[in-house]
Structure formats: structure tokens, C-alpha cells
Amino acid sequence: MTDIELAYAKTFSGASGQRVLAHLRQITIERVLGANATESELRSLESQRMLVHQIETLVSRGRGE
């Protein structure tokens, strides 16, 4: 466990942090684009999803999960 993982866990451990993570998940990972989405839109959303996933991974590692 690294210092940055601990920092992420601490930052997102409270009620506000959990609410922010849930919101980020809702607007990225759980978002569905329509059939008419452009390649640019798909790439942009995937980048956002990867960032949220990275944050969640660091939080989990910081918690020792």
C-alpha cells in the first residue's frame, strides 16, 4: 500500500467522498450512449470511465481490499 493509495482512501472514506464517487460512477461508468454516438464521444466517455475506475482501484487498495 502506497501513500497515494492511503490518500485516496482517506479522501473518499466519508459520506461526502462516497457521494462523489457514486456520482462519478453514475455519469461515467453507468452512462449509456445511444446508437448514434460518434467515435469521438465513445473515446471521450471511455477515457472518463478509465479515470473513475482508477480512482476506485486506488481507494480499494488504500483500504486494504
Positions of PLM-derived features:
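Intrinsic-disorder/low-complexity detector
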Residues: M1-E65
